[in-house]
Amino acid sequence: MEGTLLPLFAVLLSSWSVVGDPEGPPNVDGAPPSKIAVVGAGIGGSATAHFLRQHFGPEVQVDVFEKGEVGGRLATVTVNHNDYESGGSIIHSLNLHMQEFVKQLGLKYRRSVAGKTAVFNGKEVILEETDWYLLDLFRLWWRYGISFIRLQMWVEEIMEKFMRIYKYQAHGYAFSSVEELLDSLGGSGFINMTRRPLSDSLLELGVSQRFIDEVIAPVMRVNYGQNVSIPAFIGAVSLAGAQNNLWAVEGGNKLVCSGLLKIANANLRQAQVNAISPIQSGEALQYQLSFTTAAGTGSELYDIVVLATPLQASVGSGVQFQGFTPPFDQLPGNYHSTVATIVHGYLNTSFFGFSDPRLFPFASILTTETPDLFFNSVASVCPVNISAGFRRKQPQEAGVYKVFSPQPLDKSQLKTLFRSYYSVQVTEWQPYSHYGSSQGLPPVELHPNLYYLNGIEWAGSAMEMSSVAAKNIALLAYHRWNRQTDMVDQRDLMHRIKTEL
């Protein structure tokens, strides 16, 4: 989403309780691990490999298993010889890990192409962005009073506290659970935000119900495909999509993943991991990974394993845990299904109340929660490579559009949104947790030296959140391996860091 509908929030984070004893057994002789496995080569897995290399040094072997494409949900589709983002497409200016990755890899920021946003309620456009910032602010005030100011103050307070994570990680501190991390940043207030509906929190702030219905709900729908009953902390992350200061990587965001694997000198294993089993040899504990490649089946032993792929049954990771005592329970919760449809065609602007497409000024249309609406958003999208002379197609021209919807669009629905079209490409994702389908947050530590990254997605899903979780797990794995307990789950870190300086 582009524009100034809200001056809002982005950012990050991670996971729940420990299964087993996180600190035992120790590495026996003080030697570094010889082999580490990362399962999953999306942004979380790629960043984990990078950070593991930073902390464990050049000698350790880092293998990254990926059954599909590197980049995971940072995927692209091709239309008329141009690639377009079909997955994760925006990054916030305060996403410091992602910014550092781009700098280290020598990648470039994609040139921004201006475009206005509007909100549609199924009958008419009820809120629209103009070329005049002051006019937009006046309209917000006229329609919603000071709700947007109250929201901005709330968001700024959250951001100020949450940005502490970068300082903590720069000083090497790690957390064994999301509760510990949240508590260190914002105390019980942050933890409670993961349990309380966004709508309740906003109403308590004095934000009007109308503002929630017409501004907040559309942002939730486009970013997570869900409504304002999602937890408040997740809602704050989602509101990042309403900011101006967003960016993307020239050539596609997935280039970050392949680049991180390269500079980490990681071995990419194109394989499906089928099973993980603990192997005890004296006091030493290793994990046997059984996997399938195009050439057949195999297995290898690893000292440390990081799972950077969702483990919930609804996603179908294919990973089984064998021989663990006690046995692993199935991780609770489901992932939310959403459909990204990339259409090359002519937008039916009359559906939105503009009979003449030349008078349709919007690049993005968000929607309110209306029973008859079959889509969450539709937007004119730009290719991942933007030339100096590129301009966004006008509505009377054939353009490339991305439609988010809860279900695949049938022909009649496509005909409703488009006067005609040349091509349709459909990607069905399970990109986000279905918030409210699980009580509590998944663990970071499944077993000694066995870590789970994707529990972060139950606190909020974004590229930077996965990157923060990756850094946390790399630090946690390093400190656990080396018995540096004073670097894990420490209290009053801001004061402690000040005294270290």
List PLM regions with ranges.
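Glycine-rich FAD pyrophosphate-binding loop
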Residues: 53-79
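Conserved FAD-binding subdomain of flavin-dependent enzymes
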Residues: 73, 81-113
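Helix-loop-beta segment of a Rossmann-like dinucleotide-binding subdomain
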Residues: 175-189, 217-264
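Mobile amphipathic helical/loop "lid" adjacent to a hydrophobic cofactor/ligand pocket
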Residues: 103-104, 108-227
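Helical element adjacent to the flavin cofactor pocket in flavoenzyme catalytic cores
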Residues: 234-304
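C-terminal segments that line or cap access tunnels to active or ligand-binding sites in enzymes
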Residues: 299-304, 309-486
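Active-site-proximal substrate-binding core of FAD-dependent oxidoreductases
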Residues: 478-501
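N-terminal Rossmann-like FAD-binding beta1-loop-alpha1 element of flavoenzymes
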Residues: 27-63
